[in-house]
A protein has these predicted regions:
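Active-site microenvironment for binding and transforming phosphate-containing groups
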Residues: 1-209
Length: 209
């Protein structure tokens, strides 16, 4: 279900629309419920442990979802190519709010970083039961990096304890999109992984403990 909280802010409820196949925490493939499972993988389509929540990316919007591991133990969103992800924790480590920020109204990277950070801070004010624990962002071009780094240092000071992870799609690194995958593991906490879609390089992990 899609609920527009306000302009540029949309809440998505979990719908049983996808599941995962794979053999490890990050080597998985998400499939629509309408897709037949691979031979031998029939259980993936029906067992709760394989169910996945998918967060839609909306244009110029902060899309968010509150995860429920009793319903789905995997989380996916659209591949990242400049968007940011924010993770907020509620009163328990099972209670997690995830935001896909696709605001892109500024002409420069530093402006985009500032706008996304400020908009999510404002949003958190409307969700007082949650606090931000992580932010995933794309590194800017070299010319903007000093100003962006200065902004991020100030952002981290204003958000004590927050984990920030940068992914890099600037040359000479591999030109690719990036996956943001969440898994509620056997130890009963969420782990989110940021990794390259082509080279598989892991840029960081977020553990919600």
């Amino acid at each position: 279900m899609r609920t527009v909280d306000r302009p540029n802010e949309v809440h998505y409820d979990f719908e049983e629309s996808c599941y995962v196949e794979g053999d490890s925490q990050s080597l998985v493939k998400v499939k629509a419920k309408s897709d037949p499972p691979a031979r031998g993988g029939e259980q993936c389509a029906v067992l709760p442990v394989f169910q996945a929540a998918f967060l839609v990316q909306d244009v110029d919007t902060n899309s968010y979802m509150i995860l429920n591991p009793a319903t789905a133990q995997w989380f996916f969103t659209r591949p990242l190519g400049g968007c940011e992800m924010f993770v907020a924790k509620g009163s328990t480590r099972q209670d997690v709010l995830v935001i896909h920020s696709n605001l892109d109204r500024c002409r420069n990277k530093v402006g985009n970083l500032q706008e996304k950070g400020a908009s999510v801070d404002e949003m958190m004010g409307r969700h007082p039961g949650y606090h931000l624990i992580a932010r995933v962002y794309s590194e800017p071009p070299a010319a903007e990096k000093p100003a962006a780094d200065a902004y991020m240092r100030g952002y981290e000071r204003g958000h004590p304890g927050i984990l920030t992870i940068a992914y890099n799609n600037q040359p000479p690194t591999t030109l690719q999109y990036f996956q943001f995958i969440g898994h509620y593991n056997d130890a009963q906490y969420w782990i989110f992984t940021v990794k390259g879609e082509i080279d598989g390089k892991v840029f960081g992990r977020i553990q919600v403990r």
